[in-house]
Regions:
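Glycoside hydrolase catalytic-domain context in secreted enzymes
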Residues: 1-622, 634-646
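Short beta-alpha junctions and helix-cap segments that line functional grooves
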Residues: 625-627
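Surface-exposed, short loops/turns at beta-strand junctions within beta-sandwich domains
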Residues: 630-632
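Short beta-strand elements
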Residues: 647-659
């Protein structure tokens, strides 16, 4: 068992980046490669995928998540599990491993974005927003589920019988292995929920937890607990059966060294050219172009100064690349030099990655931050002199990989102070600035966006990230990524997400100067960059939308076909992600302003008009009603089509009626 979250040795972009590709075929292929490389090293189980919905980028583990949207979480769960486990209903085939969906449940919604903090939400929100990703994993026949560290409405997830038995086992019909997160059984005591190890073991076993990860609570206590207790013995027998069934499904009784004996240096696929090719494709499609004032793509002959602590940094794999090796990384400098030639553009570090005070807060990771022998002011002075002699400046900035990930919650999600000082110095030169951001979360980029001519969100892009970025900078690849999570303008907007409820006093343009509306007096309600947003080197025009019918009936298997025409009006061929949102105008519970229901990533040549069709069924219109039943309700629905959650130029309406 190991955390193979986004690659074994072939490290792909972090999961939050992967979902910005909106290419779930490619995400599945990456998971399949991860499984194959893991299989060759004798690993049988990975603790992936994580499908926790996250609306607060202060939380460090957002880097492992699919973002803020439920549909994206459902698709991510399904396709990653298919890539890891294959299509077999029971037996895990050769070159595949068992997946483990996590963290059950709602771990991605800690109060104030603080790691391991309590989660407090209504059951309605839990079911409508947070649980569908886990259910999708169960439907995909995931072999394991991992409990969460957090309390959910006052009850720690690992000891929560309602959550794990009644919902996961009885309602979702999950029959596989339930494993605790690291030491979570023992932490039932720390939570104040269990009065000692014996009660912790009892509570976890009653909640149908099968494996106690990394503590000896089960080992020390279960013998006494089941002695002369028929009910507890029955629970233990069921747990043992589920674990043995998993081993059987993996073929470990026939071959305990599954995968290892087939491996040799000659036939190993680890870091092979095909795997790197997939990593490059996924990196290119995950990168999001956030701003471009015509400065991109670059001409090869234009002299550009590449400045910043990430200009030649290999540690760009993200914190949870457990088996990854930074020496496999192609840096930004490597990628640019491969295209334009060595020594054609000047490079320099420009600033420290983070300040000493922040490094001290990283705990055991402090020693992984390089010792600085040159002052930040001296580095900035060198960078300014380099920039003065160049036509354009490329700034490679971002947070340290150790500032995100587990235990990486932050209250200020801006650029580290040394880098902000560098940015401030460069912007005074009035040079064209292309800013590249490496991060494991959406950062507050309001000032950076204002003073950059182009802005690229690279995330932590994996081993091929430098080549992918260079290909985008020089137009070899046309960016197509779109955000799977909103970028706030300021930390005070958090949590921020596109599918919010309307409120009784919405912030409408016609009420711009009306005080008593749902708005801030010192900040816009809108994010800096919205869910689904991302630019291309070409432009697209949404020409028309039509429906094949205006009425569909309940319980009739009616299908409503939405047809849209999209034209590539720019100078480049490209991929556009056409997005379909639905608004339920009225419901027995208040409905979001819009919800993503479908999308298609479509290749459109310059000058071409593409016709794209979507199918809407009654199933997509179902909601959790006030009594928590899941059903559709007759009424009016609006369909919106466009390029992001904020750019939806096409609208149609239809009605769902009773049979």
């Amino acid at each position: 068992m190991a955390d193979i979250i986004y690659g074994f040795r072939t490290i792909f972009p972090i999961p939050l980046a992967q979902t910005c590709s909106w290419n779930f075929d490619l995400i599945e292929e990456a998971a399949s490669i991860s499984a194959k490389e893991s299989y060759e090293e004798g690993l049988h189980v990975t603790f992936s995928p994580m499908v926790d919905i996250v609306r607060d980028p202060r939380w460090g583990r957002v880097m492992e998540s699919p973002g803020e949207d439920t549909l994206m979480a459902e698709l991510f769960a399904e396709r990653v599990i298919k890539g890891l486990q294959g299509n077999s209903e029971q037996k895990i085939p050769k070159n595949k491993i068992a997946g483990c969906v996590k963290h059950f449940a709602a771990y991605g919604a800690p109060i104030a974005g603080r790691e391991y903090n309590a989660v407090d939400m209504s059951e309605h929100t839990l079911r409508e927003v947070y649980l569908p990703g886990y259910l999708s994993a169960v439907k995909a026949k995931v072999k394991l589920v991992m409990t969460a560290f957090n309390t959910l409405n006052g009850v720690p997830s690992t000891g929560n019988e309602w959550l794990n038995k009644m919902i996961l086992r009885d309602e979702f019909k999950f029959a596989g292995v339930l494993i605790s997160d690291y030491a979570a059984v023992e932490e039932l005591i720390t939570h104040g929920y269990a009065n000692g190890p014996k009660e912790a073991a009892q509570l976890a076993l009653k909640a149908t937890v099968d494996i106690d990860m990394k503590t000896s609570v089960f080992a020390n206590e279960l013998g006494a607990i089941v002695n002369n207790n028929e009910q507890m013995m029955d629970l233990l027998n069921k747990a043992v059966y589920r674990i043995l069934s998993l081993k059987n499904d993996l073929g470990l009784f026939e071959d305990p060294y599954r995968g290892l004996k087939e491996r040799s240096a000659e036939n190993s696929s680890i870091l092979c050219s095909e795997h790197k090719k997939t990593a490059l494709m996924l990196s290119e499609e995950s990168i999001v172009l956030l701003k471009n004032n015509g400065v991109l793509p670059l001409e090869k002959g234009k002299k550009a100064a590449i400045i910043g602590p990430y200009h030649d940094e290999k540690s760009t794999l993200g914190m949870w690349a457990i088996k990854g090796d930074i020496n496999d990384t192609i840096t930004l400098k490597d990628g640019i030099n491969e295209i334009v030639g060595n020594n054609k553009n000047p490079f320099c570090r420009g600033s420290h990655l983070i300040e000493k005070e922040t490094a001290h807060l990283l705990g055991k990771f402090e020693d992984k931050i390089p010792n600085e022998r040159i002052s930040n002011d001296e580095l900035i002075e060198e960078a300014v002199n380099l920039a003065k002699d160049s036509e354009i400046v490329i700034l490679a900035l971002g947070e340290s990989i150790f500032q995100s990930g587990e235990g990486g919650s932050r209250t200020e999600i801006t650029l580290p102070k040394p880098q902000q000082k560098l940015f401030d110095a460069i912007k005074k030169l009035n040079k064209q600035i292309i800013t590249i951001i490496y991060s494991g979360r959406p950062l507050i980029l309001t000032d950076v966006e204002k003073h950059s001519d182009a802005l690229i969100q690279a995330w932590f892009p994996g081993i091929m990230g430098g080549k992918a970025l260079a290909n985008i900078l020089y137009g070899i690849s046309n960016p197509s990524g779109k955000l799977s999570m909103s970028f706030p303008r300021s930390v005070g907007q958090i949590p921020i997400y596109y599918n919010e409820l309307n409120t009784g006093r919405p912030d409408l343009p016609e009420n711009a100067f009306y005080r008593f509306a749902s708005r801030y007096i010192d900040e816009s309600n809108k994010p800096l960059f919205s869910f689904g947003y991302g630019l291309s080197y070409t432009t697209y025009q949404y020409n028309s939308v039509s429906l094949n019918k205006k009425l569909i009936r309940q319980n009739s298997h009616d299908e409503l076909i939405v047809t849209v025409e999209v034209e590539n009006t720019g100078d480049y061929d490209g991929y556009e992600i056409v997005q379909l949102y639905i608004r339920d105008q009225f419901g027995s519970t208040a409905r979001p302003v819009k919800v993503l229901k479908d999308f298609k990533k479509v290749f459109i040549r310059k000058g071409e008009v593409k016709t794209i069709s979507f199918t809407i069924t009654e199933e997509q219109l179902k909601i959790y009603q006030s009594d928590l039943s899941f059903a559709s309700e007759p009424g009016q629905f609006d369909v919106y089509i466009g390029s992001s959650s904020e750019d939806l130029p096409l609208k149609e309406s239809f009605e769902l009626i009773q049979s």
